[in-house]
């Protein structure tokens, strides 16, 4: 159900739900996705699942900070919360080109949120066996992984809208969307898993500092523009 709530953010041509704070709603729903996973693991009454919960909480706290800061930088640049205005802002300039470092960090953060290789540490390490789905089979197993892949499809759409500024019914949008999905799927068979301590170190020592630098830089640019023109 929470995975379905994400699609309310998608700016359909005939979408009657004209949300003003779409980006804020997006962050809120993404954050809610963690709680069903925690409940599913806790109900399974399995030691491996409990270990997965502990690892999940620390990992989510670390990288949700990056996700929130990147979205905040985007809001600071466009000075609006609507995805449609985000498209209008990128008609002549694409975020993919002049803040490409944030684009790469955003992809890493999404891979962690989606539990994809090489960051599927909460369910992929040998000491955790299979993570939270260890005690589930048949319908429950299908529902768990169906929600995961629904999130995968939606997040790639939001990524293209935020950083590419593509019209969401165009041929180029669909083509780049399929290419991104293909890359995301084949990553599982190409990359090796990173060590957990390295993952946390990269977040708090390297990536967070870089994102904060961009935040301060963008804020100073906006202040300078305001002083010059107003």
Name what the model sees in each region:
Residues 1-230:
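Core, highly hydrophobic multi-pass alpha-helical transmembrane subunits of bioenergetic inner membranes
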């Amino acid at each position: 159900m929470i995975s379905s709530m994400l699609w309310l953010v998608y700016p359909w041509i005939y979408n009657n739900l004209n949300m003003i704070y779409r980006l804020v709603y997006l962050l809120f729903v993404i954050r809610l996705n963690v709680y069903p996973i925690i409940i599913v693991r806790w109900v399974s009454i399995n030691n491996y699942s409990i270990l997965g919960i502990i690892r999940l909480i620390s990992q989510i706290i670390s990288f949700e900070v990056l996700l929130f800061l990147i979205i905040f930088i985007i809001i600071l640049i466009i000075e609006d919360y609507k995805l449609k205005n985000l498209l209008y802002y990128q008609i002549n300039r694409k975020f993919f080109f002049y803040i490409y470092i944030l684009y790469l960090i955003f992809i890493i953060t999404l891979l962690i949120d989606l539990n994809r290789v090489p960051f599927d540490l909460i369910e992929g390490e040998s000491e955790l066996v299979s993570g939270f789905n260890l005690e589930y089979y048949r319908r429950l197993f299908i529902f768990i992984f169906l929600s995961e892949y629904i999130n995968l499809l939606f997040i790639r759409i939001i990524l293209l809208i935020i950083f590419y500024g593509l019209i969401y019914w165009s041929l180029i949008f669909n083509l780049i969307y399929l290419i991104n999905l293909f890359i995301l799927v084949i990553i599982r068979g190409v990359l090796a898993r990173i060590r957990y301590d390295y993952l946390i170190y990269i977040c708090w020592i390297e990536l967070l500092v870089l994102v904060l630098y961009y935040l301060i830089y963008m804020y100073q640019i906006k202040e300078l523009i305001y002083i010059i023109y107003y």
